[in-house]
Amino acid sequence: MPRASLIRQAPTRLRGAVCHCLLLGALASGQASAELAADPLDVYETLPVPYPAHWIFVHDAAFFHMFEGKMILLDPTRQEKTEQYKGMLNTSFLAPFARSDLRRELYAVDLFYSRGWTGERTDVVTIYDQATLEKIDEIVLPFAKRSMTMPEKFAAQLIDHDRFLLVFNMNPATSVSVVDVARRAFVTEIEIPACALTYPTGPRGFSTLCGDGSMVSVQLDADGRLKSRERVAAFFDPGVDPLFEEGTIIEGVGYFPTFHGDVQEIDFRGDTATVGQRWSLVSERQRAMNWRPGGHQITAADKRGRLYVLMQPDGGEGTHKDGGSEVWVYDVAERARVQRTPLQHWGNSIAVTAGTKPQLIVNNPEDMTIDVYDARSGTLERTLEDFGMETSFLVYTMHQGE
């Protein structure tokens, strides 16, 4: 008997079940005969270059496995985690970091050992493309001297229209390696005994802060070799009120807080650093309450040239790295405080984004999250977390020189 006749003679419920099975069979047969589209391979997304002004790089020092550090690129204005995370690149052993928007490149001063964490050491300037975060080149340094200290922004700086990369060395004597990133070549080593770090100075030079309270200014020739060296006489007593080396440079003038709550101006616009005015961050009443700076990266600046300082109450001997509970903002032209921002969580480092709506970025040392505040109102907007961070001590913004 034909199939249609059998179906018509079946009870209503059975007839419906049979029709349903036939329909599923027909669909399955059609799906089996159709070819599945192949998943696309080798799909690469690129980032906008130059990066948006409000993006940040967070340095993960990876304290428990330092040869696997990373720089994580984030958009702190976004609410969703999938929109905050833009990418990352690997770094090794607390690598100093620099960014060139002129060359659209990123530089990590890595060091490697031939057998993981032991064996022969090699120091390398690893070069990444900003758009893809892919490694595009490297410059091997001729000796293993790159400093391996807590992350410092002034441990690697670009000068002379981003042609020369300055790398701070300590082994244990201190020096600076000059690397020509345009020619992809090491140039020279300049000794800076008893001094540390590199603050861009003049047209093609740097200054370095010395342990006796003085400073040395160096200028390079067109090839990147030593042209001149001048010592700036001691201008502070490290045994009485030391300077934090983590200053901030605003339009060529550096602002360096002291342990006891002053700030020292240093003008880096000429061939040789010029010591400027020293003024107080605190009132006499606040000084009596032991308000003072504290933390790792304790200063930042916004596009308007305002100075941000991480402050702690009840400070004392040995608390200079403990972080702080407030950020105080200063008009450097007036040398006066204009804003006071209490933090929701204790902070260890700060940064301020370069966008038209600046955000205050604060590292939380307890759980390694990042708090994002409206820099002008002081309102906590969001907390960045669960983005692959282990030990964050430093945030780089898109300001020139970071």
Name the predicted role of every residue range.
Residues 132-175, 183-197:
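Asp-box/WD-like beta-propeller blade repeats and closely related beta-sheet repeat scaffolds
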Residues 52-54, 102-104, 161-163, 203-204, ...:
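Short coil/turn segments that connect the beta-strands within blades of beta-propeller domains
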Residues 38-46, 90-99, 146-157, 192-203, ...:
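Repeated scaffold domains used in trafficking and secretory/extracellular systems
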